[in-house]
Structures are given as structure tokens and as C-alpha cells.
């Protein structure tokens, strides 16, 4: 599973694959940074150590997955298909808000059947970098957002460490430190850290390997 911090629907079925997860997104002037851990589990077993939970919805719009791996990826695939058609009809890239609304509508429509939470972030010409939460059918724009089972361990840290007006590199460091802290505390989060930086210039992908993760006092 990508086990969400606040799952929806029924309890996980035995053997269901989940991403017991830590996901995060941060706005900066001119773009966004998204990050996630990479551990996927089925029950007590880790079935994938390097799963990329940052899924593209469009050229400069991504979502971060948590909850049931199958459910979350299905929502992302449906949203990406609708946004592709939307872009063709408009003859221009879709807005990040439109993408977040598509994800929100799918999640709410199938809320009784799905165990998934997707965080949407990206860049468009109208609003620049944006981060949206879609949990439970709500749609909220935030300067930064965290989610997944690991997020419960880092609320205090992110509230204290976040500063408005951070540079892209500061946002990447903030995201890396927060996810690494969650991975050190949450048994369902682990592996490597995937980072995506989205700006008008394009998308920059980075991977922070296990031996490159920040070290903390308790380690």
C-alpha cells in the first residue's frame, strides 16, 4: 500500500498493496517542489523499495500518491486522461486548479470504493506555482502541504521550519529534511526520496539515495 495518513473507505484488505507514505509539496516564487519517499508495502512485507509516488498529470502538473497503490494510480491515470483531452479542446495546457478539480471530483465520486489521497501541484501561466490538497472531496490551496502516514511525525517540524519566500534550493532542502525525518520515525515510509521541481522552464527530477539522506540526532 501507499498507506495514507487519513485513509478513506474500508480498512485495507489482507495483502493489498499500499504506499505507507510521506508526501510533500511546497510553493516558491515561480514554481513548486514535490517530494516523496519510495516504500511500498503489502501487509508487513515491503514489496517495492524504490517506487516513484510522484505521478505526472500533464506537462507541468504532478500529483503525489498515498493510500492504496492501485487506487491512487487509477485516479492519477483517469485524471491524466481527462486533462489530455481538456488540453486538446482548449488548445493550451490546463491550469493547475483545473487538474486539482479533476482529481477532487474523481476522488469524491468514488469515495466509498477508493482508499487514496492525491496531492496536486504544478505551474501554469496564470497563477505560477500552486499546491492543492484534495482529501475527502475538499479543495484547498496551501503554501505547502504534507500527507501520508509519515506526515503525523513532522507537523511540528514543518510548521517551525517553513519560511515564506524560500528559494527553489531552500524548498528542496526543506522537503528533503522533512521527508527524511518522517522516514526515520514511520515504519511505513522509507527507501529513497524522489524530488520534482516544476517551473516555467520545465521539470527537474532528482533522487536522494539512502546514503545521501540527512542524518539526525537520534541516528
UniProtKB/Swiss-Prot annotation:
Keyword Hydrolase: yes
Sequence positions bearing N6-acetyllysine: 53, 109
Domain of life: Eukaryota
Residue runs in coiled coils: none
Cellular component aspect of the GO annotation: cytosol; extracellular exosome; nucleus; proteasome complex; proteasome core complex; proteasome core complex, beta-subunit complex; spermatoproteasome complex
Main localization of the protein described in the UniProt heading: cytoplasm
Catalytic activity: Cleavage of peptide bonds with very broad specificity
Class of this enzyme: hydrolase
Hydrolase listed as a keyword: yes
Effect of residue 165 to D: In PRAAS3; digenic inheritance; patient also carries a mutation in PSMB4; patients' cells show reduction of proteasome content and cysteine-type endopeptidase activity of the proteasome
Modification after translation (UniProt): Autocleaved. The resulting N-terminal Thr residue of the mature subunit is responsible for the nucleophile proteolytic activity.
Induction, per UniProt: Up-regulated by interferon gamma (at protein level). Up-regulated by IRF1. Up-regulated by tumor necrosis factor-alpha (at protein level). Up-regulated by tetrodotoxin (TTX) in glial cells. Up-regulated in Crohn's bowel disease (CD). Up-regulated by heat shock treatment. Up-regulated by CD40L via the NFKB1 pathway in cancer cells.
Membrane-traversing stretches: none
EC numbers: 3.4.25.1
GO molecular function, one term: endopeptidase activity
Role noted for this protein: The proteasome is a multicatalytic proteinase complex which is characterized by its ability to cleave peptides with Arg, Phe, Tyr, Leu, and Glu adjacent to the leaving group at neutral or slightly basic pH. The proteasome has an ATP-dependent proteolytic activity. This subunit is involved in antigen processing to generate class I binding peptides. Replacement of PSMB6 by PSMB9 increases the capacity of the immunoproteasome to cleave model peptides after hydrophobic and basic residues.
Remarks, miscellaneous: Encoded in the MHC class II region.
Complexes and interactors: The 26S proteasome consists of a 20S proteasome core and two 19S regulatory subunits. The 20S proteasome core is composed of 28 subunits that are arranged in four stacked rings, resulting in a barrel-shaped structure. The two end rings are each formed by seven alpha subunits, and the two central rings are each formed by seven beta subunits. The catalytic chamber with the active sites is on the inside of the barrel. Component of the immunoproteasome, where it displaces the equivalent housekeeping subunit PSMB6.
Protein name from the UniProt record: Proteasome subunit beta type-9
